[in-house]
């Protein structure tokens, strides 16, 4: 993989930041890199709330918020439900178009909070719908795939 280190850091940290801000406390995020044919694939999987069907086509559009900004609980970066300007995923999409790599995602919205106005309590142990951590880890989340050509 030949790419400017700062750019690669911005790409990965942008997806990680979104994963952290959408995964309740006591949750889990996984990241792995592997060679797949002629590509290097970086996968970032969060076990968070997932993205609603309505928002799936909009998240790379730029300055898009998945909920009303008044509903953000902390407004502090890297905390659950912090919210943001919606610039990270736009930046990653622009980088992908200019630097010849692909970005895609799969997501499952937590069935207990199906709309953007339904709120996750922010801590798995505070959720009234599940019995334990594993119950949360199997209900929702998103996986982002970054595919970089090897040179």
Language-model features, listed with the residues they occupy:
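Conserved micro-motifs of the catalytic ATP-binding
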Residues: 3
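A residue-level detector for a conserved hydrophobic packing site
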Residues: 8-9
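Short helix-loop "hinge" at the ATP-lid/N-box region of the Bergerat-fold HATPase_c
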Residues: 18-20
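Short beta-strand/loop element within the Bergerat-fold HATPase_c
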Residues: 26-38
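Acidic ATP/Mg2+-coordinating residue in the GHKL
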Residues: 46
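Short conserved segment of the HATPase_c
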Residues: 51-76
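Glycine-rich phosphate-binding loop
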Residues: 72-94
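Conserved glycine-/histidine-rich ATP-lid loop and adjacent helix of the Bergerat-fold HATPase_c
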Residues: 91-104
């Amino acid at each position: 993989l030949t790419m400017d280190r700062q750019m690669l850091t911005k790409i990965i940290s942008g997806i990680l930041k979104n994963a952290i801000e959408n995964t309740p406390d006591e949750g889990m995020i996984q990241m792995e890199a592997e060679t797949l044919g002629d590509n290097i694939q970086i996968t970032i999987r969060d076990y968070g709330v997932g993205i609603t069907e309505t928002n799936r086509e909009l998240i790379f559009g730029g300055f898009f918020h998945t909920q009303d900004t008044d509903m953000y609980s902390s407004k502090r970066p890297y905390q659950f439900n912090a919210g943001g300007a919606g610039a990270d995923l736009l930046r990653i999409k622009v980088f992908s178009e200019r630097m010849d790599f692909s970005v895609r995602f799969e997501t499952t919205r937590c069935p207990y909070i199906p709309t953007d106005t339904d709120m996750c309590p922010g801590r798995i142990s505070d959720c009234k719908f599940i019995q334990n951590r594993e119950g949360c880890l199997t209900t929702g989340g998103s996986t982002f795939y970054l595919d970089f050509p090897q040179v």
